[in-house]
Amino acid sequence: MKASRFFIGTLKEAPADAEIVSHKLMVRAGMIRRVAGGIYNYLPIGLRSIRKVEAIVREEMNRAGAIELLMPAVQPAELWQESGRWEKYGPELLRFKDRKQSDFVIGPTHEEVVTDIARNQIKSYRQLPVNFYQVQTKFRDEIRPRFGVMRGREFIMKDAYSFDKDMDGLRESYRKMYDAYVRIFTRLGLDFRAVAADNGSIGGSGSHEFHVIAETGEDAIAYCPTSDFAANVEAAEALPLHAERAAPAEEMKKTATPGKAKCEAVAELLNIPLERTIKSIILATENEGAEPTIWLLMLRGDHDLNEIKASKLPGLADFRMATEAEIIETFGTPPGYLGPLNTKKPVKVVADRTVANMSDFVVGSNEVDYHTTGVNWGRDLPEPVVADIRNVKKGDPSPDGKGVIDICRGIEVGHVFQLGTKYSEAMNATCLDETGKPRPMEMGCYGIGVTRILGAAIEQNFDDRGIIWPESIAPFEVVLCPMGYDRSEAVREAADKLYATLLEAGIDVILDDRGERPGVMFADWELIGVPHRLVIGDRGLKDGKLEYQGRRDAEATLLPVEDAAQTVIAKVRAALAR
């Protein structure tokens, strides 16, 4: 490629609405331009990187035995009504009517469509296993699209769907996809972690997320630096922090705590560690034809409720936060001084694992300006229902017993799910088993955010000059910057020869023949993030030298003209082989 025949749309300034580095640099590097909120044009520079991501994804999906197809972006409402997600999905599902007033959606995902394919095309267990995948444009009507391609409304995604005759088959399909994802993100040159995760709105029984590690990541990841353990904070198991409950050492006592409604303030007033206080979270669940059930969830004062874990407790699937009126009616006092002692009405108490092992702790007295100290299980309170209902914290013991937890931020770029029969049962996608009986197929689904990968890669690879692409997804691997290409025959001949040699070796190279000043050329290609740069000039040629600089290098080095091509070829191939 020659730059004079290519579109390079670099900008000196980022748009005012760009909040994070990747959004700013993708616009400035001429990769994207905004069309509407969360919707972008992908300019030639950006599209080249997208195609490289797609190529790696396709190679690894094919290697894992998946079969590519293409499903429609527009889907009939009937399929979503069959699965039950027409009502459940919410406003992120873009719905519209055609001229016949029939309901349709723009697909945010394709479980329903692919299940429809399977139920119509797969009749026998002998046709299984099968794994279909596509690379398709999706649309989710985000309430607040932001961060460029990181949280857009329209985006490109690879989604795959496996069908098996039984759970053993599903587990094997899942393993193959998990391994394929590890290979994909390794080849993309990203620092990533695979973490145990919650299934969310997709449903199913087991899942892992793949996160690119970056300070700007929206997700908190709990991991153990001395083992392989990693999980989304929402899913990470929180072990009890007290091995055994100590015997009571204090008498229970009602204590004045005027104006101290927060655990931190109570601990400071009483001159005790925050870890001895109890935080009371009040939830409510509806009962048809009866009053709501009120729940009191007890956490240590320095811990936070994990709502996903709480929602999985029996009876709490559809909980909501209790209203102030419900709290006053049940406890006799407004929030701030609540606890399990002397409630006006019965409540269901659930204690976090750590709280269940505490002794001589402090709870609200259900009276404004008062707390009760020296409270103990068994003596002052009945033994509680015990569950893991909190988020893990840095320094907690790792669930695998091999160290302690640390927390980092991550950007989710992939997710694999074991769906089971959630969709096949709802949509009657069955096949005949070995006995001739119809059986719902076991499904898995596996997604990768193709366009999101670009933003995540930039968040992990940039400096004050611009993007620093991994070779595997750089729009170009090498840029040739001739000084005076249009004025010096020697420079032009050397540049053209080097260009031809690199092309013949299969290197993705661009020759900047625009006639720009050196400062403009260098600034453009550093902003765009091309990994390798060779500068050809009359002065260097007289000495038989070219100037080489890797995008991560602090300084340039001189290479003999006759060695320059092979040196760069070796560097590119070594990087791609990692």
Curated annotation (Swiss-Prot):
Gene3D superfamilies: Anticodon-binding domain, Bira Bifunctional Protein, Domain 2, YbaK/aminoacyl-tRNA synthetase-associated domain. Transmembrane segments: none annotated. One of its GO terms (biological process) is prolyl-tRNA aminoacylation. It is found in: Cytoplasm. It is an enzyme of class 6 (ligase). Keywords: Aminoacyl-tRNA synthetase, ATP-binding, Cytoplasm, Ligase, Nucleotide-binding, Protein biosynthesis. One of its GO terms (cellular component) is cytosol. The keyword Heme does not apply. Its EC number is 6.1.1.15. Signal peptide: none annotated. One of its GO terms (molecular function) is aminoacyl-tRNA deacylase activity. Its main location: cytoplasm. The keyword Aminoacyl-tRNA synthetase applies. It catalyses: tRNA(Pro) + L-proline + ATP = L-prolyl-tRNA(Pro) + AMP + diphosphate. It holds the Pfam family tRNA-synt_2b. Belongs to the class-II aminoacyl-tRNA synthetase family. ProS type 1 subfamily. Homodimer. Consists of three domains: the N-terminal catalytic domain, the editing domain and the C-terminal anticodon-binding domain. Catalyzes the attachment of proline to tRNA(Pro) in a two-step reaction: proline is first activated by ATP to form Pro-AMP and then transferred to the acceptor end of tRNA(Pro). As ProRS can inadvertently accommodate and process non-cognate amino acids such as alanine and cysteine, to avoid such errors it has two additional distinct editing activities against alanine. One activity is designated as 'pretransfer' editing and involves the tRNA(Pro)-independent hydrolysis of activated Ala-AMP. HAMAP family: Pro_tRNA_synth_type1. This is Proline--tRNA ligase. It comes from Paraburkholderia xenovorans (strain LB400). The gene is proS.
